[in-house]
Curated annotation (Swiss-Prot):
Forms a complex with DabB. Part of an energy-coupled inorganic carbon pump. Its cofactor is Zn(2+). It is found in: Cell inner membrane. One of its GO terms (cellular component) is plasma membrane. This is Probable inorganic carbon transporter subunit DabA.
């Protein structure tokens, strides 16, 4: 039999009447869990700032058509009336979430965090006078709440008088008031905890239980809330029409540019001077164009994690970062080691690193001790003032000075990945068989299986900014919001191994003996490219390397001139670009992926001679080398899905920056090192800042439109893949993504309709 609990509720003249309540625990727990699972499906996960990942703001509504989802959400948000009691409930919920979820910003850690949010709330809420207002009855009620959050939800639903048929709707409404905090908790429970147990466990069941308890105390008539007044959806429908017009205009323009290039796709050139494989990121497109104009260079596009699902521990780091798309689980742990250097340099580095740790620890202790902060200010105030002056008036000089001081104290050393399987520590490294398998798959996916140049560069990317909570949003999304240079260096190291090359030759990929692979990193803020070649043991043609470096520097200059037009600067292009990366007051160091519009899966010959204006994700692909469509299948179900997340985040952050973005950076406050709030207490903002999508308050820089995917491959192959994968059916048939196929034989353009039919585009 199911066990039962009895909840004794007292009566007072000033409180709501409370009655005795009996119910079966097991049955109710299952019912509540099922309801919560249903209502949380529409909550979009929110990634923390350190690994800020673009995600569709309406991810939970993708089962609807794009138009239906937008109308439903816009109408609901605009029809929500202001309610003072609701704001009080929100304020308390923000306080509890901020305290529990904090990861090092707070001076004093919330007690009982290791037992979970609900347990911690149970223990501490009776001491929160701002919540219970020292009312004895309320304090007694708080002290006698059930131990399980599901039981608390049932208790509160009954206390609020929510009818059974309305309970799921009521829970959905409850979650919708703070979607940012709810989304972050969803990320913790569904994404962060995929690899093990969470140190401070929390779930949306806990979140709902705590919120409903607070609601019972501060807003007991919440169930009687006036229904949201549905605003006429005419404005939203007009918005959708505007988006459609932009999409039609852009598609017509893009296909018009591609049409004359169709006859050039099969033209094969001679052996290139060097080949560079860039991330598919839209910021790579103009830089690739610039470097190709300077010599006989070939560039390719591939996901910036270079096909390696790894976690990487930095040489100086104490944390391990997942350097692969969030859709994948890291399979391998990789460490770094110092490249052979003189013993004195390594010793100096280690001592300097330890000295900086001690200095930081002492500073933190003095800063947060009850008696020493004033003395700290008195002793360091003048130096802090000088630092602030330099960073404000001469940011480039200030950064250079900081770098020089760091080099004096702790000289930097070059590192290389340790990827060989460790027999003593088997969870570290990659076996030889897996090295071969991942290297082959990467080369086939990027279309680099023959005609290798003497020098092949895998170029990851990252950004360089100051005082920017959203710094990871400018890094590589395919690397989980981290910089991609280490993945590039890792794949290059694997492909330089003789044993790997021999195995690849047996599988039909013959890499010439004089071909050398190197990793590199493209700084998308300044367009600097750093090539990592110190760990390469093979002979590198120094003339080619020197010429490539000179051409990369010229490409940087040319691309800066192109980019500066969009940044509205009157200064010298290169000087202003560098200043933006060093200036701690700069709200727009770069435009990121703003204006992204299309995802092109095709050989580079199709787009090489076209100015795509930095608006296209470019993934290299040769359908003639993919008879069964497995390579295209991977491209459409992985990188294209990530591109759609990016596209929709920019789209929704533009059309409603308050609801789906994060507002102006000027009023941001970092909360618990996990996200930002507007002011001192708001929902956790979960989209892009105003400055990332708007030229100014009234004019958008990003053009909101859905992703246009263009695939150079026969329709029958594409149709088979769409039928095979539900995610593709959802995105294409619900019109979250538009798909155009270019037939390689007839050179006709076809559009995939939501009815699963193809129509010719004329």
């Amino acid at each position: 039999m199911s066990s039962h609990i009895t909840l004794i509720k007292t009566n007072t003249s000033n409180e709501n009447q409370m009655t005795q309540c009996n119910y079966p625990v097991d049955n109710d727990v299952m019912i509540i869990q099922a309801m919560v699972n249903n209502v949380t499906k529409q909550i979009t996960p929110v990634w923390p700032l350190e690994k800020f990942i673009a995600c569709n703001s309406l991810h939970g509504f993708e089962s609807m058509s794009f138009e239906e989802a937008v109308i439903q959400n816009q109408t609901a948000k605009k029809g929500t009336p202001f309610n003072e009691k609701l704001e009080r409930v929100n304020w308390h919920m923000i306080k509890w979430c901020g305290s529990f979820l904090d990861i090092g910003q707070g001076t004093i850690e919330m007690p009982h965090r290791d037992k979970g949010l609900y347990f911690g709330f149970l223990k501490l809420a009776p001491f929160d006078s701002t919540l219970h207002q020292n009312n004895k009855s309320t304090k007694n009620w708080l002290s006698n709440l059930p131990e399980m959050p599901e039981q608390a939800i049932r208790l509160c639903l009954d206390k609020l008088g929510v009818l059974n048929q309305r309970q799921e709707e009521f829970l959905q409404s409850t979650l919708s008031h703070l979607p940012g905090w709810a989304g972050y908790i969803k990320w913790i429970s569904e994404w962060k905890n995929r690899n093990g147990k969470e140190e401070n466990p929390v779930s949306l069941v806990d979140f709902l239980a705590v919120r409903l308890i607070i609601t019972c105390i501060l807003w007991p008539e919440a169930n009687l809330e006036e229904k949201k007044k549905e605003k006429d959806s005419a404005d939203t429908k007009q918005l959708i029409q505007n988006i459609k017009h932009k999409e039609d205009d852009y598609r017509q323009l893009l296909l018009k540019k591609l049409l004359p290039e169709l006859n050039k796709v099969q033209i094969k050139g001679n052996r290139a001077k060097a080949q560079m494989v860039f991330c598919i990121d839209v910021r790579s497109e103009p830089f690739r164009r610039c470097i190709e104009k300077l010599g006989h260079y070939e560039t390719l596009g591939f996901a910036g994690f270079f096909g390696l699902p790894v976690s990487i521990k930095d040489y100086d780091g104490e944390t391990i970062k997942d350097s692969c798309p969030v859709l994948l689980k890291p399979r391998f742990n990789i460490h770094e080691k110092a490249i052979a250097a003189n013993e004195h340099c390594l010793e100096h580095h280690e001592k300097g690193k330890e000295f900086k740790k001690i200095l930081n620890r002492v500073y933190q202790q003095l800063k947060y001790n009850f008696s020493t902060p004033f003395a700290l200010v008195e002793s360091l105030g003048i130096w802090c003032g000088i630092t602030m002056f330099l960073k404000s008036c001469s940011p480039i000089f200030a950064r250079r000075l900081t770098q020089d001081l760091n080099e004096m104290i702790c000289p930097s050393i070059q590192t290389q990945p340790v990827f060989e399987l460790d027999l003593l520590e088997k969870e570290v490294g990659i076996s030889l068989q897996e090295q071969i398998a991942y290297a082959e798959m990467a080369l086939r996916l990027m279309g680099l299986t023959d005609n290798f140049a003497k020098l092949v560069i895998f170029c990851g990317h990252g950004s360089s900014t100051q005082n920017n909570p959203y710094a990871s949003a400018l890094d590589c999304g395919a690397c989980g919001g981290n910089q991609g240079g280490k993945n590039a260096q890792l794949l290059a190291s694997i492909l330089n191994k003789i044993t790997v090359r021999r195995a690849l030759a047996e599988n039909g990929i013959n890499i010439p003996q004089d071909t050398v692979f190197c990793g590199a990193q493209h700084d998308t803020t300044t367009d600097e490219v750093e090539i990592y070649h110190s760990n390469v043991s093979q002979f590198i043609d120094q003339d080619i390397l020197d010429q490539l470096r000179a051409d990369l520097n010229m490409a940087k200059h040319n691309n800066n001139l192109e980019r500066i037009n969009y940044l509205n600067s009157i200064d010298c292009a290169e000087k202003d670009i560098v200043r933006r990366s060093a200036d701690w007051s700069e709200t727009r160091p770069e435009w990121g992926l703003a204006r992204n519009a299309a995802f092109i899966v095709a050989p580079r010959q199709l787009t090489k001679n076209i100015d795509l204006e930095g608006r296209c994700f470019l993934h290299s692909y040769d359908w003639s080398k993919d008879e069964d469509g497995t390579l295209l299948e991977t491209i459409l179900t992985a990188p294209m899905v990530v591109a759609q997340w990016i596209n929709t985040q920019y789209l929704f952050s533009t059309i409603d920056n308050v609801a789906y973005g994060s507002g102006s950076k000027i009023t941001h406050n970092v909360a618990g090192k996990i996200g930002v709030m507007q002011g001192n207490a708001s929902d956790l903002m979960h989209g892009l800042p105003l400055q990332s999508v708007m030229s100014h308050d009234e004019k958008s820089f990003h053009e909101p439109q859905r992703l246009l995917t263009v695939v150079y491959a026969p329709r029958e192959i594409i149709s088979e893949l769409v039928e095979k994968h539900d995610v593709l059916k959802t995105l294409f048939f619900n019109e979250w993504v538009h798909l155009v196929a270019i037939d390689p034989r007839s050179h006709l353009f076809y559009k995939l309709e939501k009815t699963n039919t193809w129509s010719v585009i004329k």
